């Protein structure tokens, strides 16, 4: 690792460039340099202060190894109460909501595409504004803990996965019905809930069967396991009760495995 300091010059290798998000509104270039100088010589700091949106920056090092060290050392770093998001920029910059339809509301959208790390500690977010990206959502949800995956869909919903279960639980308690702001300044109040067994899996396939139970008071309960696609024919397949006087209540329970 070489010495610190900002060296002004032509842009270098993209492997040397990192993205820094979730910065405080009063951040200065010198403040960013102070956070990253120990990782190596800095070629350039490009601070973006957008009206109505949180600032972010691109920091370019002389050596790609220093950039990698900075990502590992400063991602999630608490700076003046703000948990920094530090990562390598992703290629294929995109805008707007994803195309396509059906399923979970269309293809994913985002400025650089969602990260690939996944977790079972997942929440579903609804009520996102049209310009909200996965990065905006990830920044918002990181107030509750370490986010390892975030994605958004064109129907205004999103999915967020946390590293730890307690962070997921805290996110529902702290961030449900909070004000969300996109990188374009659009705001909306969002709802956050734990992804339950009946919620969309957003790309994770689940093998399911339907357990059908017929509960009859005064008679023996009957149960059968049938494929989910046959559930709609349920009433045609269940046996009728011979003596209606014995029936007090009849109910069907569908349990997705």
Curated annotation (Swiss-Prot):
SMART domains xref list: RRM (SM00360)
Q: Name one Pfam family in it.
A: RRM_1
Location in the cell:
Cytoplasm; Nucleus speckle
Give all residue intervals belonging to the RRM domain: 16-91, 121-195
Region Disordered: what ranges? 88-116
Note whether RNA-binding occurs among the keywords: yes
Where are the N-acetylserine residues found in this chain?
A: 2
Q: What is the superkingdom listed in this entry's lineage?
A: Eukaryota
**UniProt xrefs under Gene3D superfamilies:** 3.30.70.330
Alphabetic keyword roster: Acetylation, Cytoplasm, mRNA processing, mRNA splicing, Nucleus, Repeat, RNA-binding
Q: Which GO terms describe its cellular component?
A: cytoplasm; nuclear speck
Q: Name one GO biological process term.
A: alternative mRNA splicing, via spliceosome
Annotated PROSITE patterns: RRM
Q: Where is the composition biased (Gly residues)?
A: 93-108
| Principal localisation | cytoplasm
Describe the function of this protein: May play a role in preventing exon skipping, ensuring the accuracy of splicing and regulating alternative splicing.
Q: Which family does it belong to?
A: Belongs to the splicing factor SR family.
Protein name, as recorded: Serine/arginine-rich splicing factor 1
């Amino acid at each position: 690792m070489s010495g610190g300091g900002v060296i002004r010059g032509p842009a270098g290798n993209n492997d040397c460039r990192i993205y820094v998000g979730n910065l405080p509104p009063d951040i200065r270039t010198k403040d960013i340099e102070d956070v990253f100088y120990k990782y190596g010589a800095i070629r350039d700091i490009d601070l973006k202060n957008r009206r109505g949106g949180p600032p972010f920056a691109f920091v370019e090092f002389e050596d790609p190894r220093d950039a990698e060290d900075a990502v590992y050392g400063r991602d999630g770093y608490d700076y003046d109460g703000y948990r920094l998001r530090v990562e390598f920029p992703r290629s294929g910059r995109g805008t707007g909501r994803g195309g396509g339809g059906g399923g979970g509301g269309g293809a994913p959208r985002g400025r650089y595409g969602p990260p690939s790390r996944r977790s079972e500690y997942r929440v579903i977010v609804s009520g996102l504004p049209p310009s909200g990206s996965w990065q905006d959502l990830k920044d918002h949800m990181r107030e509750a803990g370490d986010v390892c995956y975030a994605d958004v869909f064109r129907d205004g919903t999103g999915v967020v996965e946390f590293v730890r279960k307690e962070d997921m639980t805290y996110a529902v308690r702290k961030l449900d019905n909070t004000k969300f702001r996109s990188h374009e300044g659009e705001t909306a109040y969002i709802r956050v809930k734990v992804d339950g067994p009946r919620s969309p899996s957003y790309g994770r396939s689940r093998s399911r069967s339907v357990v059908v139970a017929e509960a009859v008071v005064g008679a023996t309960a009957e149960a059968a396991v049938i494929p989910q696609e046959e559930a709609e024919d349920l009433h045609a397949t269940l046996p009728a009760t011979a003596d209606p006087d014995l029936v007090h209540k009849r109910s069907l329970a569908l349990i997705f495995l």
